[in-house]
C-alpha cells in the first residue's frame, strides 16, 4: 500500500500521512469470525491500573485469527484482504474446500483467488504453512510457533519476518529481525513469506486526537509531576532528576536496566543475542 499525504489545511493535517488501503478488497468483516472486545482501559480484574496510557478509543470487534494453521490436506482459496483494527498487519479471509472460513495474517504478495494450504506436504509458496523441518534453509517465514500446536507467536506484525538459517538435530535455527538467532523445535510450524502492509511504519499520526481514536492516552513526563507522583518530580523550574539513574514511576531503575527474568528456561535456546542499537 502507498502512503497518502495531506495538504496542510490545518495544523493537525500538516505532515499527517495515512495508508491508501489499495490492497483492501472488502470492508465488511465475516460475522461468523467476530467476537466482542470489551474495553479494559489498562485495568485488571480488580479494577486496578496495570497498563498506563490506555483508555477510550473507537469501539472494535475482535477478528478470530487462525494462528495454528492446522487444517492439513485441504486447499483454501483467498476470498478477500481485509483491514483489522486490532493489529498492524492486514488479514485474509480464506475459504476451505469443505466450506469452512478462517482469517489468516496476510503476507506480502498474497492475492485474492490464490490457493493456500498447510501441512508437511504443502509447497514452499507464500501463504502456505509447514513444519520448520520441511522448510528449506534460507527461506523467509513469519507466524512462527514456539511450541508445537500452540499457534504462531513470532513475526506477526506488519512487515515482520524471520529467516531459516540451518538445522541441528531436532531444532531449527531462526534469525529474527532483532538479530537474535534462536533454536526452535523442528515440529513447530511457520508460514512462508513476509507479513504484508510494509508501509505501516512510515505513517505519521499527525495529531494527538488520532492516537486517542486508537485508545492511546497521553504520556506525561515524570519531571513535570510532583514528587509524590514520580521519583523525577518536584524541584524549582526544570530541575534535574537528582538520582544516580532514571527511575520508573515506582522507583525502579529504568532506561537501560535489563528486564528479562534471569535463568529463564528458554535462555539455552538463544544462540546469539539481539543486536545492540
Swiss-Prot record:
SMART domains: Ribosomal_L2, Ribosomal_L2_C. One of its GO terms (cellular component) is large ribosomal subunit. One of its GO terms (biological process) is cytoplasmic translation. Pfam families: Ribosomal_L2 (PF00181), Ribosomal_L2_C (PF03947). It comes from the Bacteria. The keyword RNA-binding applies. InterPro entries: NA-bd_OB-fold (IPR012340), Rib_uL2_dom2 (IPR014722), Ribosomal_uL2 (IPR002171), Ribosomal_uL2_bac/org-type (IPR005880), Ribosomal_uL2_C (IPR022669), Ribosomal_uL2_CS (IPR022671), Ribosomal_uL2_dom3 (IPR014726), Ribosomal_uL2_RNA-bd_dom (IPR022666). Keywords: Ribonucleoprotein, Ribosomal protein, RNA-binding, rRNA-binding. The keyword Ribonucleoprotein applies. Residues 36-55, 213-277 are annotated as: Disordered. One of its GO terms (molecular function) is RNA binding. Belongs to the universal ribosomal protein uL2 family. One of the primary rRNA binding proteins. Required for association of the 30S and 50S subunits to form the 70S ribosome, for tRNA binding and peptide bond formation. It has been suggested to have peptidyltransferase activity; this is somewhat controversial. Makes several contacts with the 16S rRNA in the 70S ribosome. Part of the 50S ribosomal subunit. Forms a bridge to the 30S subunit in the 70S ribosome. This is Large ribosomal subunit protein uL2. It comes from Staphylococcus aureus (strain NCTC 8325 / PS 47).
Amino acid at each position: 500500500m502507498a502512503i497518502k499525504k495531506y495538504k496542510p489545511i490545518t495544523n493537525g493535517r500538516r505532515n499527517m500521512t495515512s495508508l491508501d488501503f489499495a490492497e483492501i478488497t472488502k470492508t465488511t468483516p465475516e460475522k461468523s469470525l467476530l467476537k466482542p472486545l470489551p474495553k479494559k482501559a489498562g485495568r485488571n480484574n480488580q479494577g486496578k491500573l496495570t497498563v498506563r496510557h490506555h483508555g477510550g478509543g473507537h469501539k472494535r470487534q475482535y477478528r478470530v485469527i487462525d494462528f495454528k494453521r492446522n487444517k492439513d490436506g485441504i486447499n483454501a482459496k483467498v476470498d478477500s484482504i481485509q483491514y483489522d483494527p486490532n493489529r498492524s498487519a492486514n488479514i485474509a479471509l480464506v475459504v476451505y474446500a469443505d466450506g469452512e472460513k478462517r482469517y489468516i495474517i496476510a503476507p506480502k504478495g498474497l492475492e485474492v483467488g490464490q490457493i493456500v494450504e498447510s501441512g508437511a506436504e504443502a509447497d514452499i509458496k507464500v501463504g502456505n504453512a509447514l513444519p520448520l523441518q520441511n522448510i528449506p534453509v534460507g527461506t523467509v517465514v513469519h507466524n512462527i510457533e514456539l511450541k508445537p500446536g500452540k499457534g504462531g507467536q513470532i513475526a506477526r506484525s506488519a512487515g515482520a519476518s524471520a529467516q531459516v538459517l540451518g538445522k541441528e538435530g531436532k531444532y531449527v535455527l531462526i534469525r529474527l529481525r532483532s538479530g537474535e538467532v534462536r533454536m526452535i523445535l523442528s515440529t513447530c510450524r511457520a508460514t512462508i513469506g513476509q507479513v504484508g502492509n510494509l508501509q505501516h511504519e512510515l505513517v505519521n499520526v499527525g495529531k494527538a486526537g488520532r492516537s486517542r481514536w486508537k485508545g492511546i492516552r497521553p504520556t506525561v513526563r515524570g519531571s513535570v509531576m510532583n514528587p509524590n507522583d514520580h521519583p523525577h518530580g518536584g524541584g524549582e523550574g526544570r530541575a534535574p532528576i537528582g538520582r544516580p539513574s532514571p527511575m520508573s514511576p515506582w522507583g525502579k531503575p529504568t532506561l537501560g536496566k535489563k528486564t528479562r527474568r534471569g535463568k529463564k528456561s528458554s535462555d539455552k535456546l538463544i544462540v546469539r543475542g539481539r543486536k545492540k542499537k
